[in-house]
Amino acid sequence: MKLICYNQFNQDLFHNGMARAVEHAAALGFDGVEPLDMMPTHRAAPIYEMFDARELRRRLDGNGLCAPCCSWAIRRCDRDADAVLDATYRYIEFAAELGASYLHHTLVLSVTPLPDAPSYEQMLSAVLPTAKKIVKRCEEYGMQCLYEPQGMFFNGIAGVSGLLRAVREEYAGVGVCADLGNSLFVDESPLDVTAALIGDARHVHVKDYLCINPPRADLKGHLSRGGVQLVDCRVGEGDCRLAECLALLKNAGYSGAYSIEIDADDDTTRRAMDFVRQNG
C-alpha cells in the first residue's frame, strides 16, 4: 500500500517551498506526493512555471518518494479550448518529468449548480473534443488519464459511466480516480459509486464528510444537489462509510495508491494514514 500526501504537500509547496514540502511529506511517513494546480490558476503563475519538475523529481527521489498521479483541476473544459489545451499539455509534460503514471483532471470544476446549466448530454458533447485531445497527449507521454466523481455533471454512477463510455469510443484506456467522498455532492453513496466503478479504479482520493440535514448556519460546508450540508471531518468519523469503501477496494484486489485529501494538522493527518492502513 502506498500512501500519498495530497493537500498538505500542495499547501507546503506553494507556501513554504519545494524543499519543505518534500521533507514534510517524508517526515509524516508518506510514500509519495500528488501535485495539484488549476486551469486557470489562482496563483501568480501555474505550477509548471513556478517549480522545476526535474528538481522536484530529484528531491522526491532523494527522500524515497514517488509521484504516481498528478491532478489538474480544469474549471471549464467546455470553454477556451486552445488555452485549456496549451496549459494542460504543459502540465502533462510536468507530470511526465516526475514519472507519474496517471493524470487526473476535472472537466467542469463546480460544487454548486451552474446558472442556466445545460443538460448532462449537452455538457458532455461540449467537453468531449477537448477531453479526447488530453487523453491522446497523456498516452503520448505514457500516462493514463483518470476521471473522478466530481462536481454537478460528471459525478455519481451515471455521470462518470457516461463520460467513460463516450471517451472510450475513441480511447479505451481511460480510468477512474475513486474519490471516496465527492459523490455526496450529487446525493449518491460513495460506497455505491465505488462499487460500480471499482473495475476502473487506478488511484484513490480519501476524504470524509458529515452529512447535515437540515443544514446548520453555525457550520461551514457545501450543499449537495438535494440540499444536504457536507462538512469536512476527520477521516473515518463521517458519513462516507470509508471503512467499507476501503474494504471493498481491498477485496477487489486494488493495488494502487491512496491519496490523503484533507486539510489538517500533522496528528490528524497521521491518524488518517493509520485509518487507511488498518482498513485498506
Predicted regions and their residues:
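Glycine-rich, proline-tolerant flexible connector loops at the mouths of alpha/beta enzymes
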Residues: 34-60, 110-113
